[in-house]
Amino acid sequence: MNAEKSPENHNVDHEEIAKFEAVASRWWDLEGEFKPLHRINPLRLGYIAERAGGLFGKKVLDVGCGGGILAESMAREGATVTGLDMGFEPLQVAKLHALESGIQVDYVQETVEEHAAKHAGQYDVVTCMEMLEHVPDPQSVVRACAQLVKPGGDVFFSTLNRNGKSWLMAVVGAEYILRMVPKGTHDVKKFIKPAELLGWVDQTSLKERHITGLHYNPLTNTFKLGPGVDVNYMLHTQNK
Protein backbone atom coordinates (compact mmCIF):
# COMPACT_ATOMS: atom_id res chain seq x y z
CA MET A 1 0.00 0.00 0.00
CA ASN A 2 1.34 3.41 -0.91
CA ALA A 3 2.13 5.33 2.26
CA GLU A 4 1.99 8.70 0.47
CA LYS A 5 -1.48 10.14 0.77
CA SER A 6 -3.19 11.77 -2.19
CA PRO A 7 -6.19 14.09 -1.65
CA GLU A 8 -8.43 11.10 -2.42
CA ASN A 9 -6.84 8.50 -0.12
CA HIS A 10 -6.31 10.70 2.95
CA ASN A 11 -9.32 9.09 4.59
CA VAL A 12 -7.56 5.94 5.74
CA ASP A 13 -6.80 4.76 9.28
CA HIS A 14 -3.96 2.27 8.91
CA GLU A 15 -4.35 1.03 12.49
CA GLU A 16 -7.96 0.14 11.75
CA ILE A 17 -6.95 -1.64 8.55
CA ALA A 18 -4.27 -3.58 10.44
CA LYS A 19 -6.90 -4.92 12.89
CA PHE A 20 -8.83 -6.54 10.07
CA GLU A 21 -5.74 -7.65 8.15
CA ALA A 22 -4.68 -9.65 11.21
CA VAL A 23 -7.85 -11.76 11.26
CA ALA A 24 -8.70 -11.76 7.55
CA SER A 25 -8.00 -15.48 7.08
CA ARG A 26 -10.91 -16.28 9.41
CA TRP A 27 -13.45 -14.01 7.68
CA TRP A 28 -15.58 -16.91 6.46
CA ASP A 29 -15.30 -18.97 9.67
CA LEU A 30 -18.92 -19.07 10.83
CA GLU A 31 -17.79 -19.59 14.43
CA GLY A 32 -14.85 -17.15 14.36
CA GLU A 33 -14.35 -13.45 14.96
CA PHE A 34 -16.81 -12.52 12.23
CA LYS A 35 -19.63 -14.74 13.46
CA PRO A 36 -21.82 -11.69 14.28
CA LEU A 37 -21.48 -10.41 10.70
CA HIS A 38 -22.61 -13.79 9.37
CA ARG A 39 -25.51 -13.80 11.83
CA ILE A 40 -26.79 -10.33 10.90
CA ASN A 41 -26.14 -10.60 7.18
CA PRO A 42 -29.58 -12.07 6.31
CA LEU A 43 -31.22 -9.15 8.15
CA ARG A 44 -29.06 -6.62 6.34
CA LEU A 45 -29.60 -8.25 2.97
CA GLY A 46 -33.35 -8.46 3.47
CA TYR A 47 -33.59 -4.82 4.53
CA ILE A 48 -31.50 -3.60 1.59
CA ALA A 49 -33.34 -5.72 -0.97
CA GLU A 50 -36.78 -4.73 0.32
CA ARG A 51 -36.06 -1.01 0.59
CA ALA A 52 -34.33 -0.91 -2.81
CA GLY A 53 -37.15 -2.76 -4.54
CA GLY A 54 -35.03 -5.83 -5.22
CA LEU A 55 -31.43 -6.24 -6.33
CA PHE A 56 -31.74 -8.38 -9.45
CA GLY A 57 -30.13 -6.73 -12.45
CA LYS A 58 -28.89 -3.75 -10.45
CA LYS A 59 -25.36 -2.38 -10.29
CA VAL A 60 -24.30 -2.36 -6.63
CA LEU A 61 -21.27 -1.01 -4.77
CA ASP A 62 -20.37 -2.33 -1.31
CA VAL A 63 -18.10 0.20 0.42
CA GLY A 64 -15.84 -1.33 3.07
CA CYS A 65 -16.68 -4.83 1.88
CA GLY A 66 -14.01 -6.63 3.91
CA GLY A 67 -14.02 -10.35 3.16
CA GLY A 68 -17.15 -10.12 1.05
CA ILE A 69 -19.97 -11.47 3.22
CA LEU A 70 -22.58 -8.92 2.11
CA ALA A 71 -21.12 -8.45 -1.37
CA GLU A 72 -21.43 -12.16 -2.17
CA SER A 73 -24.98 -12.37 -0.84
CA MET A 74 -26.06 -9.41 -2.99
CA ALA A 75 -24.44 -11.03 -6.04
CA ARG A 76 -26.45 -14.19 -5.29
CA GLU A 77 -29.57 -12.02 -5.55
CA GLY A 78 -28.67 -11.24 -9.15
CA ALA A 79 -26.87 -7.92 -8.66
CA THR A 80 -23.68 -6.91 -10.44
CA VAL A 81 -21.51 -6.16 -7.41
CA THR A 82 -18.30 -4.24 -6.88
CA GLY A 83 -16.66 -4.55 -3.46
CA LEU A 84 -14.42 -1.74 -2.25
CA ASP A 85 -11.91 -1.96 0.60
CA MET A 86 -8.47 -0.68 1.56
CA GLY A 87 -7.43 -3.91 3.28
CA PHE A 88 -5.31 -6.10 1.01
CA GLU A 89 -5.69 -9.35 2.97
CA PRO A 90 -9.49 -9.14 3.38
CA LEU A 91 -9.81 -8.55 -0.37
CA GLN A 92 -7.63 -11.57 -1.13
CA VAL A 93 -9.88 -13.67 1.10
CA ALA A 94 -12.96 -12.23 -0.60
CA LYS A 95 -11.62 -12.97 -4.08
CA LEU A 96 -10.71 -16.55 -3.18
CA HIS A 97 -14.05 -17.26 -1.53
CA ALA A 98 -15.96 -15.85 -4.50
CA LEU A 99 -13.91 -18.06 -6.82
CA GLU A 100 -14.60 -21.13 -4.68
CA SER A 101 -18.30 -20.27 -4.51
CA GLY A 102 -18.67 -19.56 -8.22
CA ILE A 103 -19.87 -16.02 -7.45
CA GLN A 104 -18.83 -13.07 -9.62
CA VAL A 105 -17.84 -9.98 -7.61
CA ASP A 106 -15.37 -7.32 -8.72
CA TYR A 107 -13.15 -6.49 -5.75
CA VAL A 108 -11.15 -3.24 -5.84
CA GLN A 109 -8.57 -1.86 -3.39
CA GLU A 110 -9.14 1.89 -3.23
CA THR A 111 -10.93 4.48 -1.14
CA VAL A 112 -14.52 5.42 -1.84
CA GLU A 113 -13.33 8.95 -2.61
CA GLU A 114 -10.97 7.64 -5.29
CA HIS A 115 -13.74 5.46 -6.70
CA ALA A 116 -16.19 8.37 -6.78
CA ALA A 117 -13.73 10.46 -8.78
CA LYS A 118 -13.85 7.83 -11.55
CA HIS A 119 -17.34 6.32 -11.30
CA ALA A 120 -19.73 9.11 -10.27
CA GLY A 121 -23.40 8.35 -10.85
CA GLN A 122 -22.81 4.76 -11.98
CA TYR A 123 -24.50 2.67 -9.27
CA ASP A 124 -28.13 1.81 -8.59
CA VAL A 125 -27.38 0.87 -4.98
CA VAL A 126 -24.49 1.75 -2.65
CA THR A 127 -24.04 0.03 0.72
CA CYS A 128 -21.72 1.16 3.51
CA MET A 129 -22.06 -1.22 6.44
CA GLU A 130 -20.13 -0.78 9.71
CA MET A 131 -17.44 1.25 7.95
CA LEU A 132 -18.06 4.88 8.90
CA GLU A 133 -16.77 4.36 12.45
CA HIS A 134 -13.44 3.05 11.14
CA VAL A 135 -12.29 6.07 9.08
CA PRO A 136 -10.93 9.50 10.12
CA ASP A 137 -13.52 11.46 8.10
CA PRO A 138 -16.87 9.65 7.87
CA GLN A 139 -18.57 12.69 6.36
CA SER A 140 -16.24 12.40 3.36
CA VAL A 141 -17.45 8.82 2.87
CA VAL A 142 -21.08 9.96 2.94
CA ARG A 143 -20.34 12.60 0.29
CA ALA A 144 -18.59 10.06 -1.93
CA CYS A 145 -21.45 7.57 -1.63
CA ALA A 146 -23.87 10.30 -2.71
CA GLN A 147 -21.68 11.03 -5.74
CA LEU A 148 -21.55 7.37 -6.77
CA VAL A 149 -25.28 6.61 -6.88
CA LYS A 150 -27.53 7.31 -9.85
CA PRO A 151 -30.44 9.77 -9.58
CA GLY A 152 -33.20 7.89 -7.77
CA GLY A 153 -30.73 5.29 -6.54
CA ASP A 154 -30.46 3.99 -2.98
CA VAL A 155 -27.65 4.38 -0.43
CA PHE A 156 -27.58 2.40 2.82
CA PHE A 157 -25.46 3.12 5.89
CA SER A 158 -25.09 1.17 9.12
CA THR A 159 -23.08 2.18 12.17
CA LEU A 160 -23.22 2.50 15.96
CA ASN A 161 -24.79 5.25 18.03
CA ARG A 162 -22.50 7.08 20.47
CA ASN A 163 -23.82 6.89 24.02
CA GLY A 164 -23.41 4.98 27.26
CA LYS A 165 -25.66 2.10 26.24
CA SER A 166 -23.80 1.48 22.98
CA TRP A 167 -20.50 1.48 24.88
CA LEU A 168 -21.87 -1.09 27.32
CA MET A 169 -23.40 -3.26 24.59
CA ALA A 170 -20.89 -3.01 21.74
CA VAL A 171 -17.63 -2.63 23.67
CA VAL A 172 -17.99 -4.02 27.19
CA GLY A 173 -20.60 -6.64 26.33
CA ALA A 174 -19.62 -7.75 22.82
CA GLU A 175 -15.83 -7.51 23.22
CA TYR A 176 -15.11 -8.34 26.88
CA ILE A 177 -18.05 -10.29 28.31
CA LEU A 178 -19.63 -12.22 25.43
CA ARG A 179 -16.43 -12.08 23.33
CA MET A 180 -18.46 -11.88 20.16
CA VAL A 181 -15.81 -9.73 18.45
CA PRO A 182 -12.07 -9.22 19.14
CA LYS A 183 -11.08 -6.78 21.87
CA GLY A 184 -10.26 -3.37 20.43
CA THR A 185 -12.60 -3.72 17.46
CA HIS A 186 -14.57 -0.64 18.47
CA ASP A 187 -13.69 2.83 19.72
CA VAL A 188 -16.76 4.50 21.22
CA LYS A 189 -15.36 7.94 20.39
CA LYS A 190 -15.74 7.06 16.71
CA PHE A 191 -19.38 5.99 17.02
CA ILE A 192 -21.85 8.25 15.20
CA LYS A 193 -25.10 9.65 16.51
CA PRO A 194 -28.02 9.37 14.06
CA ALA A 195 -28.43 13.15 14.11
CA GLU A 196 -24.80 13.54 13.00
CA LEU A 197 -25.19 11.06 10.16
CA LEU A 198 -28.46 12.64 9.05
CA GLY A 199 -26.80 16.05 9.15
CA TRP A 200 -24.10 14.84 6.75
CA VAL A 201 -26.74 13.26 4.51
CA ASP A 202 -28.65 16.55 4.40
CA GLN A 203 -25.55 18.25 2.98
CA THR A 204 -25.59 15.94 -0.06
CA SER A 205 -28.12 15.05 -2.75
CA LEU A 206 -29.38 12.19 -0.56
CA LYS A 207 -32.69 12.19 1.29
CA GLU A 208 -33.56 10.10 4.34
CA ARG A 209 -36.15 7.41 3.60
CA HIS A 210 -36.09 5.09 6.62
CA ILE A 211 -34.08 4.31 9.74
CA THR A 212 -34.20 1.16 11.88
CA GLY A 213 -32.37 -0.32 14.83
CA LEU A 214 -30.51 -3.63 14.83
CA HIS A 215 -31.04 -5.34 18.19
CA TYR A 216 -29.30 -8.27 19.89
CA ASN A 217 -31.01 -10.36 22.56
CA PRO A 218 -28.33 -12.15 24.65
CA LEU A 219 -30.92 -14.40 26.28
CA THR A 220 -32.07 -15.90 22.98
CA ASN A 221 -28.82 -15.17 21.11
CA THR A 222 -30.80 -13.65 18.25
CA PHE A 223 -30.79 -10.45 16.22
CA LYS A 224 -33.74 -8.50 14.86
CA LEU A 225 -34.56 -5.19 13.19
CA GLY A 226 -36.97 -2.82 14.89
CA PRO A 227 -37.61 0.58 16.45
CA GLY A 228 -34.93 2.13 18.63
CA VAL A 229 -31.58 3.35 17.31
CA ASP A 230 -29.71 3.57 20.60
CA VAL A 231 -27.01 1.03 19.65
CA ASN A 232 -26.73 -0.37 16.10
CA TYR A 233 -28.80 1.23 13.37
CA MET A 234 -29.30 1.19 9.60
CA LEU A 235 -30.25 4.17 7.45
CA HIS A 236 -31.83 4.05 3.99
CA THR A 237 -31.35 7.15 1.85
CA GLN A 238 -32.21 7.89 -1.76
CA ASN A 239 -30.62 10.21 -4.28
CA LYS A 240 -32.94 13.10 -5.15
Curated annotation (Swiss-Prot):
S-adenosyl-L-methionine binds at R44, G64, D85, M129. The keyword Methyltransferase applies. Pfam families: Methyltransf_23. Its EC number is 2.1.1.222, 2.1.1.64. One of its GO terms (biological process) is methylation. It comes from the Bacteria. It catalyses: a 3-demethylubiquinol + S-adenosyl-L-methionine = a ubiquinol + S-adenosyl-L-homocysteine + H(+); a 3-(all-trans-polyprenyl)benzene-1,2-diol + S-adenosyl-L-methionine = a 2-methoxy-6-(all-trans-polyprenyl)phenol + S-adenosyl-L-homocysteine + H(+). Keywords: Methyltransferase, S-adenosyl-L-methionine, Transferase, Ubiquinone biosynthesis. GO terms for molecular function: 2-polyprenyl-6-hydroxyphenol methylase activity; 3-demethylubiquinol 3-O-methyltransferase activity; polyprenyldihydroxybenzoate methyltransferase activity. InterPro entries: SAM-dependent_MTases_sf (IPR029063), UbiG_MeTrfase (IPR010233). HAMAP family: UbiG. This is Ubiquinone biosynthesis O-methyltransferase. It comes from Shigella boydii serotype 18 (strain CDC 3083-94 / BS512). The gene is ubiG.
